[in-house]
């Protein structure tokens, strides 16, 4: 099933590891086969990895962007997820953590990544006074 991306003028995204930028007009891109695509708003930079949930999101993002080298990010992901689950008591969030782990084990990195956003949202609700990295809505800052 094709993936249709509607792009804003100047919008950047990563396509199979390459940074691509749309021109000065709105555009539509249709991908006919499987590819790793991540919009600029969903990309977290290393200096934005400042909270426990973001320490989960980042290695999942790297596994998604570099499926061939995913194993080098797995240990960091597993360690950080285990730490997070050790302190969280919310059963819904714990179920999300389990689902993220299952998606990663199945190499369904995009699903794991999008579910990891829920952890950031949960964390942002608890630490609302802290503003750093990719927000649950995808806006940096």
Swiss-Prot record:
Transmembrane segments: none annotated. The keyword Ribonucleoprotein does not apply. Pfam families: FlbT. It comes from the Bacteria. GO terms for biological process: bacterial-type flagellum organization; mRNA catabolic process; negative regulation of bacterial-type flagellum assembly. The keyword Amino-acid biosynthesis does not apply. Belongs to the FlbT family. This is Probable flagellum biosynthesis repressor protein FlbT. It comes from Caulobacter vibrioides (strain NA1000 / CB15N). The gene is flbT.
